[in-house]
Amino acid sequence: MKVIFVIQGEGRGHLTQALALKQMLLHEGHEVVKVLVGKSKNRVIPEFFQNKIGTPIEVFDSPNFLPSKDNRKFNLLRSLAYNTLLVPSYLSSIHLIRKNIQECGADIIINFYEVLCGITCSLFRFGIPEVCIGHQYLFLHPSFQMPGKYPVPESLLKFFTRITCMGATAKLALSIRDYEDEPVHGIKVV
């Protein structure tokens, strides 16, 4: 089976998950044919990832949340203004994602919490499964409760998370705690 990874590259967790999954897929005889990484203008894809992924990487601009002055939470107004100015760049990114999915011959799309991948898959319906992976999909689980002092409003997190998985065939919610799968919501807890 041929696989394309689309990864939200702002943190290091999704990149590390992609490295681990790639090794598992290779062990089972599958091939990761392309890796797309979304990032903001200020981020650099870490060298450890570039050295270890062993598959062609293409980087694209992707929305992100800007921190507050004290760097303890994100600044909603600043983030909205900043990302609104970059909409033309994000439209180019959607085109890049679409083109790569269409041309790489993948049998499946693995989306590591990349919002523009969710939008692209919802708009264009490629006829192949999109599987979304990340601990954030646990936010959509009816039994999950947000910690008391979380820096981002729960409704905003859930809204953003839903956009990342629009058009998804499955959502794999990574968790260290036991939760039942939620077939109604398409969530499998792993």
Regions found by a protein language model. Name each.
Residues I7-L19:
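A short, glycine/small-residue-rich beta-strand->loop->alpha-helix junction that serves as a flexible
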